[in-house]
UniProtKB/Swiss-Prot annotation:
Function: H(+)-stimulated, divalent metal cation uptake system.
Keyword annotations of the record: Cell inner membrane, Cell membrane, Ion transport, Membrane, Symport, Transmembrane, Transmembrane helix, Transport
HAMAP family tied to this protein: NRAMP
Protein name: Divalent metal cation transporter MntH
Main location: membrane
């Protein structure tokens, strides 16, 4: 009986009722929690295995110096995800649907193809990260880890048929576990407070490679597929009755984004600071792979718990981000070309590149780098339309961006695109 009562309180209809009562000025106890969830799902993409690789290398090579980059990237992510939620709420459509309605059909098909490629490349990194975690923690082969990852993520995706709230609870539990794990890692590593605060608050680049890593941190933080996804998730809570309700709902969504991105930011800051305290401080400046980090943590920190917690955090981050990647792929296909395929089929298709990488014996580190390069191509295609649409009063109505928000968004968008062009140029030229 208690189980049935609990399930009723977390059902989609119950969440919608709680949200409606709060927006109508008749909040129930804890009814404000009904608005929290979409940004937690989006936040998972900001702590995927690609972030592990860039944060660890930045911390081991430059200590705390690039902490400010992580903080700045997180603030940019807050703005971008807020705009995505705002677009979905104002239009009742996700970003791909708005693009489909307003762009020429040939261009829409090009958008769809690049978005699918970026989503698959992103899922490659997430999938390999989870498979690598199974290998490090339990001694499984990468192929066994990959097959286990595919099975677990498929079973988790099966929950979505029972409603969005169960999925939000599952993903939320995973991201909170990852955050708890890295807070523990930070405590075990005993960082120096003064250099940590200096790196967090004082911008600077020690050399040219630091700029390259900073661009990599930003590229691993801003994820096109969750920009598409978040605009879809913001429509699920409640059908708003009028403009006043819509504005009130947007305030809650803004808080949701702040909470979700703050958790993701805490994870990334803890990750880089841990690498700085454990590796840079002991002269290990060349730790650049996830495997090296796992193997060196226990000997340096002096506790085997450190390695196990790191491996478990990697596993949960890989699994949860792979789940979110599959959901994003559904939104991308449905939005751009108005076609849906079963989740199991999408899960199978997006597994194939990871399985091919493992069978061909390609280094997981090289695959992660390649996935980040492909990701860099897709960022402008999501950011530019998002900024243009949310600044258009005909599309957004009373949720249109203020001029100041559009101005800041333009600066952020230009900076992100420029840094990603720099990463691509540096990668292909070898500089």
């Amino acid at each position: 009986m208690r189980t049935g009562s609990m399930l009723r309180t977390i059902s989609d209809s119950a969440i919608r009722d709680q949200a409606a009562s709060t927006l109508s000025g008749k909040p129930r106890r804890w009814s404000w929690t009904a608005f929290f969830g979409p940004a937690l799902i989006a936040a998972v993409a900001y702590i995927d295995p690609g972030n592990f690789a860039t944060n660890i290398e930045a911390g081991s090579r430059y200590g705390y110096t690039l902490l400010w980059v992580v903080l700045a990237a997180n603030l940019m992510a807050m703005l971008i995800q807020t705009l995505s939620a705002r677009l979905g709420l104002a239009t009742g459509q996700n970003l791909p649907q708005v693009i489909r309605a307003r762009y020429p059909r040939p261009l829409v098909w090009c958008y769809w193809v690049q978005a699918e490629i970026v989503a698959i490349a992103t899922d490659l990194a997430e999938f390999l990260g989870a498979a690598l975690a199974f290998h490090l923690l339990f001694g499984l082969s990468l192929m066994e880890g990959a097959l286990l990852t595919g099975t677990i993520t498929y079973l988790a995706l099966h929950l979505y048929r029972y409603g969005f709230r169960l999925m939000e609870i599952l993903i939320g539990a995973m991201i909170l576990a990852v955050a708890g794990g890295f807070i523990l890692e930070l405590v075990l590593s005993r960082p120096e407070p003064a250099p940590l605060l200096k790196g967090l608050l004082i911008p600077g680049f020690p050399d040219g490679y630091a700029l390259y890593l900073a661009a990599g941190i930003l590229g691993a933080t801003v994820m096109p597929h969750v920009i598409y996804l978040h605009s879809a998730l913001s429509q699920q809570r409640i059908q708003v009755k009028d403009d006043a309700h819509r504005l009130r709902l947007m305030r809650y969504y803004r808080l949701d984004v702040i909470l979700g991105m703050a958790i993701a930011g805490l994870v990334n800051l803890s990750m880089l600071a841990m690498a700085a305290a454990v590796f840079h401080a002991t002269g290990r400046l060349d730790v650049a792979t996830i495997s090296d980090s796992y193997l060196l943590l226990a000997p340096v920190v002096g506790q085997v718990t450190a390695s196990h917690v790191f491996g478990l955090a990697l596993l949960l981050a890989g699994l949860s981000s792979s789940i979110v990647g599959t959901l994003s792929g559904q939104v991308i296909m449905q939005g751009f070309v108005n076609v849906s395929i079963p989740l199991w089929l999408r899960r199978l298709v997006t597994m194939l590149p990871a399985l091919a990488v493992i069978m061909l014996g390609i280094s997981e580190q090289k695959a992660l780098v390649a996935s980040q390069v492909i990701l860099s191509f897709g960022i402008p295609f999501a950011l530019v339309p998002l900024l243009c649409f949310t600044a258009n009063r005909q599309i957004m109505g009373n949720l249109v961006n203020r001029k100041s928000v559009t101005g800041v968004g333009t600066v952020v968008c230009t900076l992100i695109v420029a840094l990603n062009v720099y990463v691509l140029f540096s990668t292909f030229t070898g500089h």
